[in-house]
Amino acid sequence: MGPPEKESKAILKARGLEEEQKSERKMTSPENDSKSIQKDQGPEQEQTSESTMGPPEKESKAILKARGLEEEQKSERKMTSPENDSKSIQKDQGPEQEQTSESTMGPPEKDSKAILKARGLEEEQKSESTMSPSENVSRAILKDSGSEEVEQASERKMTSPENDSKSIQKDQGPEQEQTSETLQSKEEDEVTEADKDNGGDLQDYKAHVIAKFDTSVDLHYDSPEMKLLSDAFKPYQKTFQPHTIILHGRPGVGKSALARSIVLGWAQGKLFQKMSFVIFFSVREIKWTEKSSLAQLIAKECPDSWDLVTKIMSQPERLLFVIDGLDDMDSVLQHDDMTLSRDWKDEQPIYILMYSLLRKALLPQSFLIITTRNTGLEKLKSMVVSPLYILVEGLSASRRSQLVLENISNESDRIQVFHSLIENHQLFDQCQAPSVCSLVCEALQLQKKLGKRCTLPCQTLTGLYATLVFHQLTLKRPSQSALSQEEQITLVGLCMMAAEGVWTMRSVFYDDDLKNYSLKESEILALFHMNILLQVGHNSEQCYVFSHLSLQDFFAALYYVLEGLEEWNQHFCFIENQRSIMEVKRTDDTRLLGMKRFLFGLMNKDILKTLEVLFEYPVIPTVEQKLQHWVSLIAQQVNGTSPMDTLDAFYCLFESQDEEFVGGALKRFQEVWLLINQKMDLKVSSYCLKHCQNLKAIRVDIRDLLSVDNTLELCPVVTVQETQCKPLLMEWWGNFCSVLGSLRNLKELDLGDSILSQRAMKILCLELRNQSCRIQKLTFKSAEVVSGLKHLWKLLFSNQNLKYLNLGNTPMKDDDMKLACEALKHPKCSVETLRLDSCELTIIGYEMISTLLISTTRLKCLSLAKNRVGVKSMISLGNALSSSMCLLQKLILDNCGLTPASCHLLVSALFSNQNLTHLCLSNNSLGTEGVQQLCQFLRNPECALQRLILNHCNIVDDAYGFLAMRLANNTKLTHLSLTMNPVGDGAMKLLCEALKEPTCYLQELELVDCQLTQNCCEDLACMITTTKHLKSLDLGNNALGDKGVITLCEGLKQSSSSLRRLGLGACKLTSNCCEALSLAISCNPHLNSLNLVKNDFSTSGMLKLCSAFQCPVSNLGIIGLWKQEYYARVRRQLEEVEFVKPHVVIDGDWYASDEDDRNWWKN
């Protein structure tokens, strides 16, 4: 059941520009476009799978590209017909894949990836009256020529474009190019005698298929996508042959229409002629819980011909199943007890038959074409064998814009609607489905008609749907705005059915479902002026679907609002079988994303007032506080919250367009991390951040977005001058920066890893120069901001609140350093901390820094980590450090390539320095000689050094003796870190003896990964009971073992132990030491921080520790443990500890807690 290691994914895409042939009233008539498309084989590529309203995972997919131009005809009456978009599809198939045997029960270990690329040059013939330039197409979209059955029923204003004439060249290496006629004749020649033997039965079946689908499908079978689909099952380089094609995409983009076209194409002799039989199953038309054999299912599709069924089963290698809407069966395909059927005569629940076909247990030699929504794609991966994935996308960007704008005559209104449309990329993406595009068009027209009377928000899909649905209800009775009792029953029943469908992953409903919710089709039709619920299916029993899945999500969300009506609860049984609304908060459940956002959108006060009018009762949704609480949980779990969770919450709040509701949800936010990928992310974040009035720190990761402005791509749709189509991206960025500068409690802004153009940096710095900006700490670590540094230097002396600047990993040329130092020396510059880690500093750069150190009295901390400091550079720095005018207190020279010679120069300079209190020399090979020179400095009575970091400095042998001597008689040094040095048990004994001296004032000792064993633990236990000053001891990643910790606990149990922080992470501990450790915790009132991560504790051992954590004597506040590493019983006990002692924090990231400026040299 596990997913394959590699999956073959082909994404058929075609994006076209469309022109509209208008009637004489519009006075336009474009010519037909001719296009040529080349298809060649290319390397494997990765494609991100689309998901509904949610971020996608990156998947390795083969990308099928084609570009085409589309034209549209409009009759004078604007009569509508199904849209026939010309599509071009490319199929990529990658080599070096192994084919799974046809009888294999599971997915192959390696799925081949096929890559067929099509690239076309496009030319647009413009009519004299249409002066817009052609769209710059940057990616490909597969556009279905037809729309799904739902779209055909709901699409009242979709126009039917003409088919473009296209010529396609296929380059397949040594293979010869063939025309469609040659390909077709070749396939016909390959039809075997067995096909001819089927005689009249086969012809009758094909006639039945044609009669069934010919009225609902209109497609040209020589179109590019059909030619490419006809080759989809062909072996690639004789190494891999797909047996399953998966057509996936957003709801409503035309997957079902494409599936029906495939079946019809076979019946008409245009497609898949090597297949003797093609059987079509519509999942929405099948009651999959009923029992049947596969033969009986096929017989329903082949009326009055059981002999034909037998013939079909005799040739499974020439049998193609087309299964439409497999995701409608998701709820039953996920059962753990799924069995497999291998006999086509055995009666099983129909979902078992479908599952067995997917797994190739049933008719393993047959072929499958499956349609599914993007949200169902991940679950499908573990079921299919030898798959080829094809992405189906809907209307192109230009087509969507044209459909929305075609009924807006006023030019200023067109521009306003156009801008609001492209601002909201999620709303615009939803319009890829023709049915949604039609609903949006109707909503916009209704809003225009209502004018000032329309108070509902129009920036969101919730606002548009609310406008459309609620006014469809109220417009029926101008004199009576409220719903009658019967109408209320109908509306609430519809909402309940929609919610039940969302939770159970059902989008198809039957007569029994309508009865369960007191619904009648006639009453639904009478309640709305629009087709909310549509009849679909060709069988005797009708089934129903919402005109689009997003409408089902809307009504499902409305259910949770209506359940708060106490008056209404007397008439209807709410929540009988429904899930709690708090389950909607799970962002990883893609089926809930749409309903969740609509639910937030319905919290808008104007929408709630409209509902009050409809029901004649105050609407005070009980769900409002629950939603605000869910958002506040993100604020409380900063370390465990991903930036995508925060952004998802922001989008939900933005959907409401209600400032009071948003402010209540965000009042607890103090830290935020945002990942900005889309333009709309900026607008949504700006809207929400201005309500985070208690925000203190924000991290923003924004890449690529501000380097290219794609807004103008859609401008040709609007018939205005190009200069009027002003790019809005920088305006949105300016608004975002303005919000950051206006938050009165915001102190830290981290733009690390971001990519900001010169213009973006200019806008940012101008906003941060505002007097209202209170930001003190500004970080650009690893950000690409070099082109805009000149704007940053002006900010340094324009904002006197700025105290900290981090430019780590920013290449600093000498000219940059000159401007930076001039700004830092400015009288109005208040910067106290400057980090220039990995800035590629030169000797000239060091000279300018040295001059800076004696020219400013404000700079207190300087980091030059990961810059090479040679002898000449050290001489310059030494001259500055020895000057009485240098007031620097903290110096970080981590990984600067220091040698004993350069260390000698540094120490000589420090002898004259009475201000330096913090020094970090980590990751420099100082050796014994360098440490000896440092100890001479520590011996100096005027040495003010308090914190010394010597991690990974290759300190060996006698060096520890020198350190021990200096520690024993130094009353100023309080913190020493020797992490990742080979201290060993012998040197540890020397250090312990020094720490026991009353003249040693060391408070913190870091000894992580120092090759210590259990043999030093007796010395450590004795030391911690003797010293009165040591408060923190980190022994992590040392093999102390159970015996060592048991010995150490003897010291912890003593009342004389004043240790407050102890690190025992990754010390090879087991449950054998838990008894002693629990006892030490229970009787030690001083210990408040303990790290136990990466040890091997059993459940019994952890339960002992949990009992000790709850002991009243224990004052532990920070416990380093990963809860998810343990069984449910242990997790519950750890949660009980946090409940009993609310101040206790149990988290595996123990080092994140930076008490007492412990990580000063890292920050």
UniProtKB/Swiss-Prot annotation:
Q: Where is the composition biased (Polar residues)?
A: 128-137
Q: Where is this region: Disordered?
A: 1-201
Q: Name one GO biological process term.
A: protein storage
* One Pfam family named in its UniProt record: NOD2_WH
Q: Name one GO molecular function term.
A: structural constituent of cytoplasmic lattice
Q: State if Cell division is listed as a keyword.
A: no
Annotated keywords: ATP-binding, Cytoplasm, Cytoplasmic vesicle, Golgi apparatus, Leucine-rich repeat, Mitochondrion, Nucleotide-binding, Nucleus, Repeat
One GO cellular component term of this record is: cytoplasmic lattice
Binding site residues for ATP: G249, R250, P251, G252, V253, G254, K255, S256
Q: What is the effect of changing L308P?
A: In strain: 129/Sv and CBA/J
Q: Which InterPro entries match?
A: Leu-rich_rpt, LRR_dom_sf, NACHT_NTPase, NLRP_HD2, NLRP_innate_immun_reg, NOD1/2_WH, P-loop_NTPase
PTM notes? Phosphorylated by PRKCE.
* Residue runs in coiled coils: none
Q: What induces it?
A: (Microbial infection) Reduced by T.gondii in the testes and uterus.
- Mind telling me which Gene3D superfamilies this protein's record contains? P-loop containing nucleotide triphosphate hydrolases (3.40.50.300), Ribonuclease Inhibitor (3.80.10.10)
The LRR repeats are found at: 801-822, 830-851, 858-878, 887-906, 915-935, 944-964, 972-993, 1001-1022, 1029-1050, 1058-1079, 1086-1107
Q: After gene disruption, what is the outcome?
A: Mice appear phenotypically normal with no apparent defects in ovarian development, oocyte maturation or ovulation. Cortical granules are scattered throughout the cytoplasm in oocytes and ovulated eggs. Reduced abundance of intact MYH9/MyoIIA and MYO5A, the dense cortical actin scaffold remained present prior to exocytosis. Increase in polyspermy in the perivitelline space resulting from a decrease in efficacy of the zona pellucida block. Increase in multiple pronuclei and delay in cortical granule exocytosis and ZP2 cleavage.
Q: Family assignment?
A: Belongs to the NLRP family.
Functional summary from the UniProt entry: Component of the subcortical maternal complex (SCMC), a multiprotein complex that plays a key role in early embryonic development. The SCMC complex is a structural constituent of cytoplasmic lattices, which consist in fibrous structures found in the cytoplasm of oocytes and preimplantation embryos. They are required to store maternal proteins critical for embryonic development, such as proteins that control epigenetic reprogramming of the preimplantation embryo, and prevent their degradation or activation.
What's the subunit arrangement here?
Component of the subcortical maternal complex (SCMC), at least composed of NLRP5, KHDC3, OOEP, and TLE6. Within the complex, interacts with OOEP, KHDC3 and TLE6. The SCMC may facilitate translocation of its components between the nuclear and cytoplasmic compartments. As part of the SCMC interacts with the SCMC-associated protein ZBED3. As part of the SCMC interacts with the SCMC-associated protein CFL1/Cofilin-1. Interacts with PRKCE. Interacts with TUBB3 at cytoskeleton microtubules.
Q: What is this protein called?
A: NACHT, LRR and PYD domains-containing protein 5
Task: Give the gene name.
Answer: Nlrp5
